[in-house]
Amino acid sequence: MNLILMGLPGAGKGTQAEKIVNDYGIPHISTGDMFRAAMKNETELGLKAKSFIDAGDLVPDEVTIGIVKERLSEDDCENGFLLDGFPRTIAQAEALEGILSSLGKQLDHVLNIAVPKELLMERLTGRRVSPTTGKTYHIVYNPPKVEGKCDIDGSDLIQRDDDKPETVKRRLEVNEKQTKPLIDFYEAKGYLRQVDGNQDMNTVYADIKAILSEKRA
């Protein structure tokens, strides 16, 4: 089962990825994990990536694609994989097709967890944190016992800058602009499967399992 998982921040990708890899016995491969492993193992490409990251630069496609190819060639990917955070561009998607072809593999499904923007805003801007205990709450989904106060020590909860509406809105817009061409690309190729993320997480996963039980036409 060779899969790509897509979805905007707040769509619940992490939760669903964990369920998929546990049930199907395939590795969850995120770009960050790949970079960290390649740098830790001091592979040639890992060292190249490190030099760009240390300089505060974006890692060029050729290095990223090389690291992806190395990772997908490993033994644990023999029965499949779940890619998360790659590809991010059409050029990377086309390169991935070449990688899979060279490995005698092809994609089965591209899952896109779709959630209305206003719900993503609610999920992402509702987070509150205690600056003293580090405990995280959500004003809708996991509120403290006393509004605005930490359950543990009564400290005032704060909203991190990353969770403020203007920051979240900008992040969603950037992500949406980036992923729209990829969604169109995979839809045209018949790989795309839209998943309704505006449901409880178990229902979302039941929908994903139903999709994964189908054979691609």
Curated annotation (Swiss-Prot):
Its EC number is 2.7.4.3. One of its GO terms (molecular function) is adenylate kinase activity. Residues 30-59 are annotated as: NMP. Residues 126-163 are annotated as: LID. GO terms for cellular component: cytoplasm. Gene3D superfamilies: P-loop containing nucleotide triphosphate hydrolases. One of its GO terms (biological process) is AMP salvage. Consists of three domains, a large central CORE domain and two small peripheral domains, NMPbind and LID, which undergo movements during catalysis. The LID domain closes over the site of phosphoryl transfer upon ATP binding. Assembling and dissambling the active center during each catalytic cycle provides an effective means to prevent ATP hydrolysis. Monomer. This is Adenylate kinase. It comes from Shouchella clausii (strain KSM-K16). The lineage of its organism: Bacteria, Bacillati, Bacillota, Bacilli, Bacillales.
